């Protein structure tokens, strides 16, 4: 689906202001996967994200998206199809809304790619239903809606382009806890429908709950990758790099360090933690 091979990126190359942001990145996003990218500000994850849909081209190495190869010498006309294959929901996407009605805003993208208005509006209606926005809102101005509803409109607008990969850049930033949970459940539902998803986040619990593969970035390098279950076992390594772990993992690790219990493998979700603690309680129940 998407493959990075020895990708390097330098801002303002061949100038006194040259600044290298990515170093020898090897990365793969498989079809149907839910992949997470984690890193602090300055880790390179935003630069990497912009390579996913051809907004940036590698200084060295190559990015393959489907059957399209993007390198330093690729022409814009060769890269343009990548932007239809990979849809990016940037932080605070509601700031990009502009049309006079919700339906028109969502239909704008498909029309921009040459789809007739009637068909574009049919696609828009399908995607608005998918993101859970009732038809009573479709003829309203997007600016009359709540923040969470506006974000759903923006996400529907990306989905209306029918991308093969949906990239989410800190998608719950600024939302209250209830809206945040609902938004993550929406993305899980979209993933379950067969959509390939890439999540850029700093929230480890979301990675544990939803992703099936994760890459950790630091200063432009991938410092760890694997399934969340494997990566989050390295608690001390993550702490040394000032990266957190899921709350359930932190609790279990602290409990284990007291000597009260030994886990064969640290849980990464609340459900896993409850199951393990219940099992321990049952096993020791005869002594109580």
Swiss-Prot record:
Its main location: membrane. Residues 2-244 form the ABC transporter domain. GO terms for molecular function: ATP binding; ATP hydrolysis activity; ATPase-coupled transmembrane transporter activity. Its EC number is 7.-.-.-. It is an enzyme of class 7 (translocase). ATP binds at residues 39-46. InterPro entries: AAA+_ATPase, ABC_transporter-like_ATP-bd, ABC_transporter-like_CS, ABC_transpr_CbiO/EcfA_su, ECF_ABC_transporter_ATP-bd, EcfA2, P-loop_NTPase. It is a peripheral membrane protein. GO terms for cellular component: ATP-binding cassette (ABC) transporter complex. It is found in: Cell membrane. Pfam families: ABC_tran. Keywords: ATP-binding, Cell membrane, Membrane, Nucleotide-binding, Translocase, Transport. Belongs to the ABC transporter superfamily. Energy-coupling factor EcfA family. Forms a stable energy-coupling factor (ECF) transporter complex composed of 2 membrane-embedded substrate-binding proteins (S component), 2 ATP-binding proteins (A component) and 2 transmembrane proteins (T component). ATP-binding (A) component of a common energy-coupling factor (ECF) ABC-transporter complex. Unlike classic ABC transporters this ECF transporter provides the energy necessary to transport a number of different substrates. This is Energy-coupling factor transporter ATP-binding protein EcfA2. It comes from Lactococcus lactis subsp. cremoris (strain SK11).
